[in-house]
């Protein structure tokens, strides 16, 4: 299992939100590049970056902060938030992003996601952000009428690298990961599934690894790392076991 430390960008700073609420942002580092370097020193092999302003505005906003991260580290970066055109995908891949995450556009224009996956095989992930059983859009400010499995099945066999499933009700709350919800999606699709939202302790990582059925490909760690409820070395050892 791959563990992805998260850097969420708001107004150029590294923050964590509670339940995706932009008004409930805690700043953890004024330098995203410095935070990225810390995660590399901790031993992580991937980095998960989200442009929060971009997710709301529908276009990349924290461009300078993302570029500073890309210039400061050598591990692969997956980036989401406001990327809704093929030109946007191409620009970030050319800038050095290893995997682009598409969320809102996956709901509204699935053909664009399929085309992106064909153009950049294994470099496109789909964000499946769930609130009250339905997939959220527009920086989690709106709800679609799709459930996670219906959305995930849209992208079978087109070269999508991963589905990143987030339980919004648990995001940033340190309340524990929704193993059942993540597992249901993983069992229903052939695309690797990455768990996000509420991963609070190494016990959550152990629960994801121990569940029967399809293996969970990864987990995103956010507030748990910043708050110190997960120690990187211990988590990485468990994930690699």
UniProtKB/Swiss-Prot annotation:
| One annotated GO molecular function | 1-(5-phosphoribosyl)-5-[(5-phosphoribosylamino)methylideneamino]imidazole-4-carboxamide isomerase activity
Give me the reactions it catalyses: 1-(5-phospho-beta-D-ribosyl)-5-[(5-phospho-beta-D-ribosylamino)methylideneamino]imidazole-4-carboxamide = 5-[(5-phospho-1-deoxy-D-ribulos-1-ylimino)methylamino]-1-(5-phospho-beta-D-ribosyl)imidazole-4-carboxamide
In Gene Ontology terms, what is a biological process of this protein? L-tryptophan biosynthetic process
Look up keyword Iron-sulfur and say if it applies.
no
Organism encoding this protein: Caulobacter sp. (strain K31)
Please tell me whether the keyword DNA repair is annotated for this protein. Answer: no
What InterPro entries does its record include?
A: Aldolase_TIM (IPR013785), His_biosynth (IPR006062), HisA_bact_arch (IPR006063), Isoase_HisA-like (IPR044524), Isoase_HisA-like_bact (IPR023016), RibuloseP-bd_barrel (IPR011060)
- What is the protein name stated in its UniProt record? 1-(5-phosphoribosyl)-5-[(5-phosphoribosylamino)methylideneamino] imidazole-4-carboxamide isomerase
What's one GO-annotated cellular component?
Answer: cytoplasm
**Pathway where this protein functions:** Amino-acid biosynthesis; L-histidine biosynthesis; L-histidine from 5-phospho-alpha-D-ribose 1-diphosphate: step 4/9
Residues in the signal sequence: none
């Amino acid at each position: 299992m791959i563990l992805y430390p998260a850097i969420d960008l708001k107004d150029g700073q590294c923050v964590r939100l509670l339940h995706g609420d932009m008004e409930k942002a805690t700043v953890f580092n004024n330098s995203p590049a410095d935070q990225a370097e810390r995660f590399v020193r901790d031993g992580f092999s991937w980095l998960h970056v989200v442009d929060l302003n971009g997710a709301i505005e529908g276009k990349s906003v924290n461009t300078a902060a993302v570029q500073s991260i890309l210039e400061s580290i050598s591990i692969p970066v997956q980036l989401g938030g406001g990327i809704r055109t093929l030109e946007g995908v191409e620009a970030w891949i050319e800038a050095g992003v290893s995997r682009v995450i598409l969320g809102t556009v996956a709901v509204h224009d699935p053909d664009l996601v399929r085309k992106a996956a064909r153009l950049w095989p294994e470099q496109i992930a789909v964000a499946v952000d769930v609130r009250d059983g339905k997939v959220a859009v527009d920086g989690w400010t709106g709800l679609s009428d799709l459930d996670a499995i219906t959305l995930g099945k849209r992208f079978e066999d087109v070269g999508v690298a991963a589905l990143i499933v987030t339980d919004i009700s648990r995001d940033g709350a340190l309340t524990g990961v929704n193993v059942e919800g993540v597992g249901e999606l993983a069992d229903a699709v052939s695309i690797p599934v990455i768990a996000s939202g509420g991963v609070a302790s190494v016990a959550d990582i152990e629960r994801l690894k121990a569940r029967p059925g399809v293996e969970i490909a990864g987990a995103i760690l956010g507030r748990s790392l910043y708050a110190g409820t997960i120690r990187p070395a211990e988590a990485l050892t468990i994930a690699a076991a």
